[in-house]
Amino acid sequence: MDLEADPWRVNSEENGNNISGSVWEPDNSSVNALKSYSADSLQQEANKRVNDDYLGVNIFSNGDNIVRGTASNVYQNDVLWDRPNIGSTTQETDIRGVNRFQATDTPQYAANDEYKNWVESVRKTYFPLAEDIVSVEEIPEREGLVFKHTNYLVKHLTPLPNTDPSDDRTVVRRYSDFDWLQDVLLRKYPFRMVPELPPKKIGSQNADPLFLAKRRKGLSRFINLVMKHPVLRSDDLVLTFLTVPTDLSGWRKQAHYDTTDEFTDKHISSSFMNLWRKEFSEQWNKADERIDIALDTWVKVTVLIERYEKRMKQVAHERKLLGQILNAIPDTTEALYPQSTATVSQINEGVGLIVEHLNSCADVIERENEEVDSGLSVRFKAFIDVIIALKGLFERYKMMAGNNIPQLQRRVEINQERLNTLESNPDVKGAEYDRVKQSISRDKRSILDQMNRSWLIRECILEEFTIFHETQFLITDCFQRWIEINLRYTNNNVDNWEKICKKLRDMPLQRH
């Protein structure tokens, strides 16, 4: 049993109805005992939470605290705005206007109607506060001869375009199917905010109900974030994942599906190039510089909110325990005060009311915990998921968005000089001349292709950063819901105490 989740062992099978003191003592000797956090221990818990709960995320290496870093400037060093004049290499391309483009250091885009219209059109495609439309439930029966695995019942709650789902809109999927879906999305959309998966982990943890519950919630957040994304939700393989009723692993072996990235055969539009400003890249660098700090902060917030709810759950258990103990008072008072039957009867009646009150207070706390666990925690964690998705996008940009345009440009210049020399030499062979000319042509085409891809990547990241701005309202939503829940159940609790206070006024304080 996880003693951190249940340090009083209230859910232990050994408890039953046994209310002996030894069972209910907190396990203070254990390192998992629930105790107050220091700044360092909270940091360690936050580090562990991120590295345990997400695949491929290791931002807190060696458990070090997050400190303010320096901007990587990977976006500011992009050759497309540091070297805008590529000479004649743009004359044979569909990318019109590249040789005229010049980045500006003034925030002209703020007053640019074209940019505003573009941003508005992108924002309207993303609704992070929308209700989840996919449910993921664990199927109790596990499959597998040697290594048992868990299956999940995945159900989409709304119709999906261009699909022919089963009547109940459900499919059975296992963890490896989710892993496959994330893999193909990263292949096709490397510069989109593809969410992270919870860890798989095998062995004893695969039978741990707490781990399995956490993983199921993580899978649910993953697929719902995918379905809220304006591009990912329309992908054919996402729709296949949600609607093909057969075993997906068998389908993958037989089917032919495309995983080439989204930029294949796509050309950048001149309208986007005209609205681009260098300030965008500076904003990305600042966001990239601070994203680990933001992630660290939100993990700590979530840890502390969940920690508070755990404490309140223990309070609820102890109030029920106190009620059970108080039930023994009437028998003892009748034996202790045999000559005061009238007043003892009133006292016993009051004790019975206190027992009812304690159970009512415990029920209020349990309902609050259930609402926080099912509705509030998932929203705090979904915001963490979004931050991690943006961080992953930035990391993939650093690894995958490079180009060798400067080297190719230099080679074109050298070969052009060589070609001019060959043209002025009548003794040179035609084969050598043709070889140099073809090399120049290939390099120019490669420059154009890489420029086009770099511009498409830039457009893609700006789209993602624009829709990411809509997630700011998740912050408001999380805290408004948290405060509303606390206020509502605090009022319920106050009402209970006011009622018991009025009822106990008739308990005797002295003989009449």
From Swiss-Prot:
Membrane topology: Peripheral membrane protein
Cellular component annotations (GO), alphabetically ordered: cytosol; endosome; membrane
Region (Disordered): 1-24
Domain PX: 130-248
Any one Gene Ontology BP term: protein targeting to vacuole
Entry-linked SMART domains: PX
Cited function: Required for vacuolar protein sorting.
Name of protein: Sorting nexin MVP1
Species for this entry: Kluyveromyces lactis (strain ATCC 8585 / CBS 2359 / DSM 70799 / NBRC 1267 / NRRL Y-1140 / WM37)
